[in-house]
Every structure is written in C-alpha cells, then in structure tokens.
Amino acid sequence: MNDQNTPQVQQSTSTGGLLKRSVSRRSLFQAGGSLVALGSLAALAGCGSTNAGAPDAQASEQESGSTLRVGMEAAYAPYNWQATQESEYTIPIENVSGAYADGYDVQIAKRVAEALGAEPVAVKLSFDGLIDALASNQIDVIIAGMAPTEERRQSIDFSDPYFEGTYGLFVREGSPYQDATSLADLSGASVVGQKGTKLDEVIDEIPGVVHMTPLPSVPNVLAALQQGAADAATYNMENEAAYLKSNPGIVPVRFAEGEGFPDVVTAAVGVSKGNDEVLLAINSALANLSDAERQELWDGALERQPE
C-alpha cells in the first residue's frame, strides 16, 4: 500500500470540528434518504451559538446517532468481508441476520460515519450493483474498494482516495507465463478479472490478450485460475501475501521495472451527485488520517482477514 501519494484535502483546516460534532439525519439525509447536506458547513462544524433549549437543537439531539448505510460486497478481503462474531473492528450487516462486516473499508467507514455524526451499518450487495443501489437509495455511501473511474464519475461523485496501490498478475505454478517480465510476454494468454472493476479493465493493456468474461468476485477469479479455466488473473498487489496463502498453486508474475501495469489502484468513497458539503466532510475525515494510521488499519485488516 502506498499512502505517500494519497492526495490531502486543502480545506481540512477550516472544518476541523467535523470529526467532533454529531450531525442530525435531517441535515444529511433528505430527498428520500439521499445524502444532501442542508444549510452551511457551519451547521456541520458546530460553529453556531444555538441555545441548547431551542427546538432546533432539541431536534438535532433526537436525530443524532442515525445510521449511515454503507454499500460493500463483504466478500473482498482485506477490503471487506463477512464475519460471524462482533468485535471492535466490525459493523453489523443490515441485510444479513446475525452477520457483521470487517476489513479496511469498514475501518474507513467508521471514521466517515463519525465525521457525519452517524452509526455505520453495512449493506451487502454485489459489486456491480452498488452504484444502482446508491441511485435507488438502498445505501447512503459506497465504501467497497471502488476505483473512481471516469465512467463511474458520470453516475456518482467520489471522495479523495483512501487507498493507493498497484495491479499484478497471478499464473499457475509451472505455467509457461511464470517467467514473463513484461505485459507483452503475456500475448496470447487468457486472462480473467473481477466483473465491473478495474481488475477487468486493465486486462486490455496486455498486447494480444484473450480477455475472458469477467467473474463476480476475486475468489471466483482465483478459482478459475487454479482450475485451469484461465492462464492468468489480475489482482491488487497489496493483497498478494493473503491470496498466496489461501490459494495454493498460484504464483505472481514479476515484471521488470516499468513493464507491468501502469495504472495505480485507487479506492474512494462514492456518494450521490451534488452532495458537495457531505464530500467535504468525508474528505476532511480522510485528511485527518495520517499515512501511519492508514498503514496501521491496512496491516490490521491483513492480519484479521479470513483464510
């Protein structure tokens, strides 16, 4: 994981109270539950001098502590996965009885929810259904290891990145492609990635590739590779150790410097379009996370993720 290049939010110094002030659901969730911040940032930052006994202040107190519905797969470790036991790291999965979500995304969700004065709950959905779920008000935000691609930006807005990394390729041990040192060496190989993600899109950067039909999840992708249905599979290199541990018989391709995928893996929080004040609050929360804190959260997720 490379947090050194993660952009920092310039406005964060003027909204330092965002992490300390509880925000009412009335001010954040309007128009059928979509994220719309009413009024000014002063309301979010707690800059006003409203009398504690005033009706508006009482309403705010009653509505604070509302839920932030966070869309994710809960099947994409170490970003997010489903757990059976509650812990300090988990949040409930709203649409799966007795289940919880854990992972790096969940730790980010906790901090975003704190900035918005809400309690986070996960909503488990297929990755390719997340944007539609946001548009139809099934969820309030997407925190699911989602890359802010130009295509997705046509439908939703994104925060600053909370994760950056690189893409790689796995092949089966003993494969003729195991000793490849450039993408060109994979010419003619059948390569598979996860549906609806950059892991599928970057495959087209391999000259002469046989681009296979994408599969719903990373476990499906790696299983296809192990079973010989594909010659290679794309993956996020920051997850390499965990994937190798739980998927025997696969090995990473070691590209020469500058000969691998040029794209950078990024993940950002997705929100409905037009919610600039909410994005500012989210970006402020992310800017308050140092590189060291992000690395600690990532390392913790790697240690806890299921095998």
PLM region spans:
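N-terminal secretory signal peptides
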Residues: M1-V23, S34-A43
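N-terminal export leaders
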Residues: R25-F29
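Acidic, polar ligand-binding/catalytic clefts
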Residues: E119-D185, G260
